[in-house]
């Protein structure tokens, strides 16, 4: 049969239409529920992660106070506004694995606000008494966090704009919106909402707190004090591989499940969320749908460290060298025995010894699971997605392991190879001479430094906001990364890689 347009009217038909049965929401939506969560940055990951947890709470446990209002702050978010708006804010999650593909329609996003159309509506929504949580997936660059000083980038033009009292009703940044909404709640005698980062950063809650409190102190110390004393910013570890949706994915959804969806989400079956139980104005029972809610922030930090150093660090080891070698997808890289050995040995020999033991977690089994997930050919995870915004990733996923390895005199040559590959990747030309797009908020500065440095890392390492001062003065590190850069420049990735495999 012809595919059915995804919307409320067609849900019952969609549930019975495709070759494989599709799960659809049977819970109340629209005006019958309260939107207790406002989420900033509705992309693929949010729709495959937090929105799925909330969908399960609504479907299995009858939760009606925590539907999601999505928010887009950037002009490019108009595409998500239009896609969701055209289908009653429903969308399809397609889980792919060796066992096959499974689809279910998610209805936890109840509405969507596009800030460039109406900034006041976003502030009012956050400030509304029904809003208990404002969650974020705004990527590393959206936090205006200086990796070197660990402070707010208060001189950034957008932050400077939002700090002007005259601009409080027309902010540009997430922190401008959060502050404006919290200031209203303070004036109205309401509790502050919880600010819940779902971004892939270590100590994401602590960083969010520090950035927002720093912003608030520059605007109004009294409100900053209130946020510091009564606000909540839970730390969390989030995990689910979610590639960019392709036209092929939409066609497959129509062919196999008879659904016409403007913007479905493709993901893997695996999903994990470890979150600190720190909420200022209530929360839904996330633990009932598989989230690991922990009391101790230290527990979250240990899970975060495992995930960021092993999964995300390995993604970097796949992404930048893989792009230079001419691959397109993660699974293609892992099908190459050189790469699969390299990634395994980097995890086992250089990263694993630096990680804390977590009761009940077998690191070797976790590493094996990661190799299996990376090798999944069905989700078609694109290397450009892995390589996106590297200036916010490499300082978190690779450099801390190098610094710790130096401190304990451990091995780190493979980690240096990854950093060197990124330094070459910055130029936007692969080993065959083919150009590719470098999507990074610091691209111009990085490319200028890369051109000036050639095969020397010195120019790039001089960017203090990314690398600080310590590594530049370490002879072992400079020798290793310089050697890797020279080898890659001379021989290319595939001929250099065997030197880093035992």
Swiss-Prot record:
GO terms for molecular function: mannitol 2-dehydrogenase activity; mannitol dehydrogenase activity. It comes from the Eukaryota. GO terms for cellular component: extracellular region. Its EC number is 1.1.1.67. Keywords: NAD, Oxidoreductase. InterPro entries: 6-PGluconate_DH-like_C_sf, 6PGD_dom2, Mannitol_DH, Mannitol_DH/Oxidoreductase, Mannitol_DH_C, Mannitol_DH_N, NAD(P)-bd_dom_sf. NAD(+) binds at residues 37-48. It is an enzyme of class 1 (oxidoreductase). It catalyses: D-mannitol + NAD(+) = D-fructose + NADH + H(+). Catalyzes the NAD(H)-dependent interconversion of D-fructose and D-mannitol in the mannitol metabolic pathway. Belongs to the mannitol dehydrogenase family. Monomer. This is Mannitol 2-dehydrogenase.
